[in-house]
Structure formats: C-alpha cells, structure tokens
C-alpha cells in the first residue's frame, strides 16, 4: 500500500490535474458500480454506460471544481488567527457546507440528467425530487468528516481524502439518481 501512496504522491506532484481527474473519475465510477451491484433495480442488469456517466462527471467536472474549491478553502481565514486555529477550520466547514454543498448537489443531478439525454424539464423534476433530501443527507455525513479533513490533511491531499469517503457517498448519489422519476 505504501508503494501506491508513493506513486500517487509522485503523480500528484508531476501531473496534479490528470491525477485528480483519474482518481476522482475512478471513485465516482466505483460508487456507481457498488450501487448497481449491491442495490440493483428489479430485473435490471449491470449498465456500463450508467457507470461511465459518473466517471466522466468526476473526471471532467468535479475533479477540477473540487481541487479549486479545496485550494480556495485553504485560504479562508478569520482575522489573524493561525491557519490551523479551530475557528478557521469551522469557517472552512461552514463555507463548504453552506456554499459548496447547496451548489454541488444540484450540479451532480443536473449533469447526470443531461448525460442521460434528459431535457431541462427532466432536470427541474429531478432537482425538485432529490435536491433537499440529498442536501440533508450531505449535512449528516460531511461536516464531521470535513472537520477532520480541514484540520489534519494537507491541502494537496484533501480531494483524495474526500474521494475515499466519496465511494460511499457516490454509491448513495448513484442510487438516489437511479430512483429519480425523470
């Protein structure tokens, strides 16, 4: 396992965007694989195109947005308090949960609906069905995790740390998306 982390760290230093894109895409896709195999729809078989959509979302969109977001959050600072001060960590978690989460949740459902060939009306329906319940679930899962992430993990590894928990979160998102009526 340590050789994997050495490889990952070297890749992150030499090709940060590519490494984040592939890692994030892989983990979003893995979440869908888990959702399809562990929570299958009755009578449905595994759909590789369904897995491709979250892979592309993670690799192309979320990896870029997430990396920039975590770099921005690392600069959030209250007055002259040290970066690691608990008040700054809480401010980062508050920004993450009150700014990014309400935008990130609909971004996912919008991207999935459009990649599935849905219309803007389909997007509207999916968001009206899923946005609030997913945001509430997000607020149950992520704040405590992000407190640890922002206080213990170096900024260049925060996206990977989030991506590890995201295997489970992405499984939930994929399952939730697959149960949308649109």
Curated annotation (Swiss-Prot):
Keyword Zinc annotated: no
Transmembrane among keywords: yes
CC terms in the record's Gene Ontology section: cytoplasm; mitochondrial inner membrane; mitochondrion
Keywords: Membrane, Mitochondrion, Mitochondrion inner membrane, Transmembrane, Transmembrane helix
Family matches, as Pfam families: Mpv17_PMP22
Membrane topology value: Multi-pass membrane protein
InterPro entries (UniProt xref): Mpv17_PMP22 (IPR007248)
Membrane spanning residue stretches: 51-70, 98-118, 135-155
Signal peptide bounds: none
Subcellular location: Mitochondrion inner membrane
Highest taxon above the source species: Eukaryota
Family under the similarity heading: Belongs to the peroxisomal membrane protein PXMP2/4 family.
Task performed by this protein: May be involved in cellular response to stress. Required to maintain mitochondrial DNA (mtDNA) integrity and stability.
Name this polypeptide is given: Protein SYM1
Organism: Eremothecium gossypii (strain ATCC 10895 / CBS 109.51 / FGSC 9923 / NRRL Y-1056) (Yeast)
Gene for this chain: SYM1
